[in-house]
């Protein structure tokens, strides 16, 4: 797989402290599901976050954040964050924003 293993290790350190999180390979990378809903992931050197439309609009004001678009059609409420915008405690802040949105979604059972 072609995604940042260093970023993945850092994500695992954080999400492993959350309940009901499982990894799943998708989008050519890896995603983490919280209660069956994608909360975050990695594609190449980008952190993928599911923030909801309001928080995503705020995140898109950051110069190192862009719409999540791997098909030619952006996914509303999702963003791609450059790995270098995840340094230090920034990664945990990004992940907590996604968690805050996803933990209010209905649980998905597969």
Regions found by a protein language model. Give the residues of each.
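Charge-dense, helix-prone N-terminal extensions
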Residues: 1-110
